[in-house]
Amino acid sequence: MGSQFSVLNRKWLIERSIMIEKRKRRSNKLIKILMMGNENSAKSTFAKKVKSIYQSDKIENSDANSILPYIKLYLSNSFKDVIKFIQQHPQSPDTKPMVSTQLGIIAWDKLSSFNYIPFNFKPTKELAKYIYDICHDPLFKSYIYPIISSKREDAFYLIENCKRMSNDDYIPNDEDIIRCSKNNQSGVFDTKLEIGKSEFVFVDTGNQKCDRKKWVHQFEDVDIILFFLALDEFDLPPDEIKSQSQSVHDCYNKLNENILVFDEIVNNHFFSNTPVIVLFNKKEQLIEKLKTTTFSQHYPDYQSNSNNPNDIFSFISNQFKLRDHFPLNKRLFIHSFNSSDTNQIDFFQYVKKILEDTI
């Protein structure tokens, strides 16, 4: 009897100390936000954008100098992906056309005969013009976009600005630094911001994928979870090999994979009362894909013939709602946003309101 009382007493003391710490942190106006999502969800872009808006200090020249070689590398890789695709699909009168504009046809002819050494490749101004022209051809864009955007979320930002970035005197501006992030980070990174009388700490788990159950408890003290989702990944293959309890064949694509990750993480008992905001990104890209791709062909659970974007948004939203194991706690909030639109990132008052309603 005494030992049982001792165990219960220790448990009560632990829970009490946790509650005291949480109240202390909130009284000090410290709000800790856990950010989750894959490398193409615009999670890192969001954090950098928020930091650039709310921090009084401008991005330093040292940041521009340090990221310059990476941007050149990313630009070169995007160029090579476009050229490789063109040269792997030679055109003839018998083949299906892949370009529809005069500038696109000229660029295709130039790039199809372009010779380069992969390990000594430099994006020149002349090459940038042809890459820009062909990637702005509507028909060609429908072919190339899924390929290059699956590799980098900033791929089309690079293409859009390739003429400027190919200049010999190019120096990255603030937007370049924000948008052209270093992908495939696997550590945990904090971004701290003081806004008004409150301090916000964004905790980014990077792209850690292994043994989530072993490390997720380290973030049990977060006040809110931001879960980022790229809507246009419904036709891309999943990244991970599922556990024994989850057959690989049960995961259809990267969109479905991220919904399963959501299920695994936010339904952990550590987060049963933690508000969760799901942020849908790349809505415009999804709409563009749906013009040429049928959603139900890549997502068998979607039992509808409609390829209407609004119907598909509703379906994806419901997938998250159905996977919330604690619906009575009213902790789930779903929104769409554009990571490059600064007007949509002013959400701190909204976060505060959610926290006030849930404390």
Swiss-Prot record:
GO biological process: adenylate cyclase-modulating G protein-coupled receptor signaling pathway
Protein residues bound to GTP: 178-185, 204-208, 281-284
SMART domains the UniProt entry points to: G_alpha
SUPFAM superfamilies per record: P-loop containing nucleoside triphosphate hydrolases, Transducin (alpha subunit), insertion domain
InterPro entries in UniProt: Gprotein_alpha_su, GproteinA_insert, P-loop_NTPase
Renumbered residue ranges of the record's region G3 motif: 200-209
G5 motif as annotated region, ranges: 337-342
Residue positions binding Mg(2+): 44
CC per GO annotation: cytoplasm; heterotrimeric G-protein complex
MF-aspect GO terms: G protein-coupled receptor binding; G-protein beta/gamma-subunit complex binding; GTP binding; GTPase activity; metal ion binding
Residues with lipidation of kind N-myristoyl glycine: 2
Keyword terms: GTP-binding, Lipoprotein, Magnesium, Metal-binding, Myristate, Nucleotide-binding, Transducer
UniProt xrefs under PROSITE patterns: G_ALPHA
UniProt-annotated stretches for the region G1 motif: 32-45
Ranges where the G-alpha domain occurs: 29-359
Annotated segments matching region G2 motif: 176-185
Region annotation G4 motif: where it falls in the sequence: 277-284
Homology family: Belongs to the G-alpha family.
Annotated protein name in UniProt: Guanine nucleotide-binding protein-like alpha-11 subunit
Source organism of this protein record: Dictyostelium discoideum (Social amoeba)
